[in-house]
């Protein structure tokens, strides 16, 4: 890229990458800082996330970046980590560089600070100076650029810092104040509501019992056997109901007998009507015969039995 210079210092074991005054140094003699840098505004991968953070309240902006492959890490040892996000035929490891990258002169490891910064570089890039660029971390007072190689890295960039630092960098959402004072729940309203419901239920039950008692009293007045006993000894409700059932059975049987008698009465009335008609016919025949006898000169003597 234009305006970038890569200077390798083999004797001191450090490599510096300069970009318009921005310098990144590595303390590990086997590590290499990559010089292929892209602008943050034209970053190729939209999923890349980065966080700005000043060191100790200063004006410098420091990037802490780690590239992690999508695959699962295996075969880890102290100081190195294996990346499994590359093709099966290519196995790569990462060298861990511990220290803060602040300026060109400050290249020593700071292990006694309040927090430790880690930056991971692929091993194949640290073995040779002319290797394929993968990641770079630069620090500058006014402008800082972060680049990514477009060749082998398939993982995402992750910022390693505490959750408090991440939350401090973002915008905090203000919570609306409570418009009314908070009152803790108490058992008073619930108890009052339960008492009111219980009282209403008791009132409904009382009215229902009163209606049943009134109906039983009416039955005791209708039934002949209970009318006198209820006034003297106070007939029980069960006795009144049992006698009412017996009385209803008797009434049903009486109704059946009455219906049968009515049918017999109807039959008798029909028979009586037939007999009356026959009597009328006989009277007419008798009168006709008497008329014929008189016409022929036969005297008719009617004898009556007299004692």
From Swiss-Prot:
Biased composition (Low complexity): 122-131
Region spans: Disordered: 104-131, 168-207
Any GO CC annotation of this UniProt entry: nucleus
Compartments in which it is found: Nucleus
Keywords from the named record: DNA-binding, Nucleus, Transcription, Transcription regulation
GO molecular function, one term: DNA-binding transcription factor activity, RNA polymerase II-specific
Domain bHLH, residue spans: 196-251
Tissues of expression: Oocyte and somatic tissue. Oocytic and somatic forms of this protein exist, probably as a result of post-translational modifications or minor splicing differences.
Gene3D superfamilies: Helix-loop-helix DNA-binding domain
A biological process from GO: positive regulation of transcription by RNA polymerase II
Coarse class of the protein's main subcellular location: nucleus
InterPro entries the record matches: bHLH_dom, HLH_DNA-bd_sf, USF
Region described as Leucine-zipper: 268-289
Keyword Isomerase: no
Hydrolase as UniProt keyword: no
Biased composition regions of type Basic and acidic residues, renumbered to the chain: 187-207
Pfam families tied to this protein: HLH (PF00010)
PANTHER family hit by this protein: FI24210P1 (PTHR46117), UPSTREAM STIMULATORY FACTOR 1 (PTHR46117:SF1)
Function per UniProt: May act as a regulator of transcription factor IIIA (TFIIIA) gene expression.
Oligomer and partners: Efficient DNA binding requires dimerization with another bHLH protein. Binds DNA as a homodimer or a heterodimer.
Protein name: Upstream stimulatory factor 1
Organism: Xenopus borealis (Kenyan clawed frog)
